[in-house]
Amino acid sequence: MSELGVAVGQKIELADGSGRTAFVRYVGETAFAPGTWVGIELDEPSGKNDGSVQGERYFNCEMGYGMFVRPTTFNVIAQPPPPPPPSTFRRSVTTRPTSLNASTTRRPAPVDSGLAKRMSLNAPSPSPGPRPSRTSSTSITRSPTRSPTKQLATASSSGNPSRSGTPSTTTKPAGPTTRTRPSLSTSRHSMGPPPTPTTRTTRKPSVSSVGTRPSIGATRPVGGRASMSARSSTNRLSDPRESTGSVSSVGKSGFKRGSASPRSSDEELSASPVPASPVHQKTAALEKLTAPGAGNGGGGASPGATSPNLKATTITPRSSITNTATMNKEIEDLKAKLKVLEKKRMEDREKLNSLEKVKAERDKFERIIQTLQIKYQPQQQEIQDLKRQLKEAENRLYNVEELQAEHDTAMELATLDREMAEETAEVLKVELDALKQKNEELELEVEVLREENSEFTNGMSPEERASTGWLQMERNNERLREALIRLRDITQQQEEELKDQIKSMEEDLREFETIKEQHTTAKEKLAQTEAIVEDLREQLNNALGAEEIIESLTEQTMNQSEEIKELRAVIDDLESLKEINDELEINHVQNEKEMQEEIDLKDSIIAEQFRQANLQRESLEDMEYTLSRFRELVTSLQSDLEDMRASHAVTENESEQLNSRSRAMLDLNMKLQISASKAQVKTIDLELRRMEAQEAEQHLEIVKLFLPDTYQSDRDSVLALLRFKRLAFKANLLNGFIKERVNGQPHPGHEDDIFDGCDAIDKLTWVSAMCDRFVNAISHCSLEQFSRYEGALYELEPVERALNGWIDGLRRDDLKEKQCADELKRTIALMTHLGEVHISNDLESFADDVHMKALLMQSHLESAAISVNSLKAMVQRVIPSSGEDDELAQYFSKRAEAVVSQTRSAKVIAGKTVRALEDLKTRSLSLTPDTLEAFEQSETATRDLANMARQIGLDLHAFLHEEGRTEPYNYMEVQSCIQRSAQASSPTASSPESDLFNTYLSYLRNATSTISDLASLASDLAQTQEFDRTPAPWILRSAELKAAKTVAPDINDELRRLRDDIAEARRSIAVREEMLSTAQVKIETLESRMRDANAKAARIVDLEADLQAAKKEAAQLQEDMEKQDRELKALESDRDKWKKIASESRVVVADGSGVGVDNKASAERAVATAREMDALKKEIEALQAAVRYLREDSRRARLKEQGDYEWLAEPLVKKKPSVQEQRKQLVKKEGKAVLGELVKLVSSAKVFDLGSLPEKAEDRLKWRPAKTTPGWWVAKQMEDWEALKEWEGSVKGRVRELGGVPGSKKAEREEEAKRMVRRTAAAKLQIRLPGMEGKVGHGGGGGSGRRVQIVGSREWESLQGRLAVVV
């Protein structure tokens, strides 16, 4: 389908194989991608948009039905209704350049300012009316890689829209077209004479009628210079394909006039003249003057087709350029001013965007503040509830304190009563001890009296009884009787007093029971208060959580306030410097922009001059070669003339030939002079451009001094980008020269250089494509990724050094292709590593990757074709055709040509894939990542093909140039050698093929099928995904710097409002903190009171235990008193008995002494009494012995057997120990553990072995583990000792809290009780022994105050014996 026959309303069918049909709704240029696009409306919802792309609408349709495609991706199946024929249909053919220039003014309806500017610059004269549709050279040369057959088919199909896309058979095919890319300003000088019109509307391309030049490279700079003139309005450098696409769009717009509807905007634009401003008029005039130079470069293809008029037009533009230098300067100044205004407008837009961002941030902060206020409301309500609860708790605590005070007073009264009861009990105990002592004394005296009476009565005569001793004894008895009566009265009185005290103590106990009940109630209340306190603590914890939030908010507000202060200071500084900085900034920006524009212009000039210098160098070499040939010819002709004149045998024909040769010599001399003049002009231009390049370089060095310091951080990354571009250019340069050497005439015997050159071409293609990938990745990466490219600058230095060395080798004609290919392997490894490190795995990089693989496939196939062609020429040179091998030679030639043609066909398919991928990249589309495996397989297959072809060629070269061989070669040996090489280079082949190149062709067919699949896949838009192109990092950096300089105008109001909010929040937080601190103090006071109450409760428990012990002791004392009463009654009865006996004996004595009673009866009574006394003595001795035995047995059982029966004293159901006892047990166990740890620490302590330290001072400074150093050893032991001391201190503190501190009364009593238990004494008595006069002291006597320790029965008997002996 031709691109020039597309019109709105046509029905088309997509060429992707899906069979989808659609209607054309829009044709023209778009803003989202360069070139001409066709907007279509599909019949099914398989599209991508609704007629709008990136916010700009081109036509209207439903969502999912619209799509934009290239004009080459569909076929027209139906035409819209034909428009009425215009009156000015047929025009003169001589106005063709005007129509071409007028066609450049056609644009789509939505035109921005940049497009309008380009329209005005490129269209100096509008077209007065429509022209008949016809083809031109611009439509044919749209793509540099398009074949001439396809271009001719496109041209023929555009002439008749009703025909299909197949080429016409009547159209005469043009010759091979040159690869010129004329710009929009091409005039009639570049086209040659117009062809003669035929009966059909189709015409031959004007460019194709001109003879072709033998060198393709000579025509390349023409398109480059032409595209430069078209691109100077936009001030940017692009690929030559872009300019070609713009030319093709112009051709399409020109041919659309005949088929578009009358209502289209394009026809309106072509019918109405476009007004031109003075600047545009000057630009148009300049383009008219400069156009013939570009046209001449493109039109003069061969020396034979050059006319004198054309020669004149090649010199005229140079003089016109020099005459219009001032006009050009003026135009450049106006363009610079326009660019400055555009940049200012962009800055204004950026400022507006920053203002919108600040407004969005303000709204965001307002929303945050509102949310915080909403969050604060429940917290404030909760704090008020907590305050109310805290007040209630304080009231309850106040009531509890009052109750506690009442309980304290009650406890103090109970304590006083208890102390009084204790004092009373002690007094009673002392009195009881005194009574016991008196009782014992009385018992002893009674026994002594009994013994004295028995002794006195034994053998005493009545006279003796009547003596003074008896009377004294009677008096003593009287005293004793009185003492006993007095003692009885005292004991009765004491008993009454004790009973009264017991009654009072019982009353105290009853009162204590009531106090105990009150204590239990107080405990319950205390538990309730503790629960309330726990609730309050939980509430306080919740409040503390809110406090943490408040603190975090406070910190944020403080940080924001600091930032606000800093910003305010910065704002003040900026405002103070604003007036001064405005003019400086404007001047600086103006200078920077102008310098940047000059830099860009100089860079483009340098590139163009370098390209032209290369072309001039090539042309000079060609001219020198031609000159040398001409000189040789002149010398040969002169020698021939001399010979002919000397021989005098010149005939008439020979004279005519001589004349013709002389004329040819004169023509050649004229051509040599013309070429010499051209070379001189080119040399002058080259020197001028070199001077301009040096000037641009110096200007760049000056401009660098004005760049800001921030450029230094990205300098290496920028240099890395430029180095990648240099490497790509140098690799392409080497590739081109090596390809020329490979395609040239090979030197006999050195065909292996061609094969090595093919290998080097493939590797250089890889390097160039990889550098292009890096350039694209750097141009669309983020700032962070851009900063990471600075290391690549130094890593690529050896690569550039190697490329420079090979370029020097090319200059010296000393390039070693094999060495270059081997060294490129290291370069490929290095750049592969860099790609893995830096290139990201996104869709854009994937698109670059598959494009690179497609380029490598194309290069591999081209190398394979060149290798096969070279080996064919080598075999034909070495083995001349003879009669026998004629058929084999022809067969070999046909097979080789078939291999080359099929390889080149596969290369054409690969080129189609490359173009499709490039088209997708321009539309920001990429294939899906799942297609990577297919591309890798295809690339591997083509690489294997190229390697196989090179290996076959190298093996054949080694075989055909074998030293010492004298036998002639034949084609059978060549065939066997090719089969061996193919088998060796493809180990996967099953068996050697019988025919030539069968293995290669099988591999080639597989590769061709895969490449065809890839080509169809690349043209299928359903298999693509769209990706976003991020702006260049230097644009992002400049925007960031500009944003950092701009300050929002309403920032002061925002700061002031935020400052007021922060101050208000700070005041509220201070009030809350004060309230919380007051509550914390109150809580601590309550906790201290609770601790005091707990201590008092523990004291009450101790007092209760002491009271129970006192009760038990009082009961024991009461039992002892009752026992003493019984014993006293028994003693009194014995006393009465003895008194009765004494009175009877006194009566007997009185009767015997005075009256003379019967002596016999008294004697018998005395004898009976004596017997009775003896029996009583014996009984007393037996009883004493029994008592001694029982005492000894009791002491033995108490000391030895009592421990075995202690379990009997334990209760069957053990009482649960109190909390205090449990704590004591725990503290005791912990104390034992502390002691064990102390013993373990002492036993495990070791002295550090200083012998393990290194002897040398150098070794001591080396690193070694910290555990091997003596400092760590000592610190570890000190740490263990401090931890043990801290543990010991904590245990001691708990012992003090539990009341077990040595030195307290309770501890002393317990210790005393333990000592009393441990003592081995049987009894401790206080006995008042009689003195020397036989009297018993009552205190203060000579026998009082002595203490005797009685351990056993023997001591007691000896004491009794001493008493008897003393008495």
Swiss-Prot record:
List the subcellular locations. Answer: Cytoplasm; Cytoplasm, Cytoskeleton
For bias type Low complexity, the affected ranges are 88-99, 132-149, 164-190, 243-259
State the Gene Ontology BP annotations.
Answer: establishment of mitotic spindle orientation; nuclear migration involved in conjugation with cellular fusion
Specify where it is mainly localized.
cytoplasm
What is this protein called in UniProt? Dynactin, 150 kDa isoform
Family, according to the entry, reads as follows: Belongs to the dynactin 150 kDa subunit family.
Q: Where is this region: Disordered?
A: 76-318
List the source organism: Neurospora crassa (strain ATCC 24698 / 74-OR23-1A / CBS 708.71 / DSM 1257 / FGSC 987)
Briefly state the protein's biological role: Required for the cytoplasmic dynein-driven retrograde movement of vesicles and organelles along microtubules. Dynein-dynactin interaction is a key component of the mechanism of axonal transport of vesicles and organelles.
Task: List, alphabetically, the PANTHER family matched.
Answer: DYNACTIN 1-RELATED MICROTUBULE-BINDING
Q: Which residues form the CAP-Gly domain?
A: 28-70
Q: Which InterPro entries match?
A: CAP-Gly_dom_sf, CAP-Gly_domain, Dynactin
Ranges of compositional bias, category Polar residues: 150-163
Task: State the UniProt keywords alphabetically.
Answer: Coiled coil, Cytoplasm, Cytoskeleton, Dynein, Microtubule
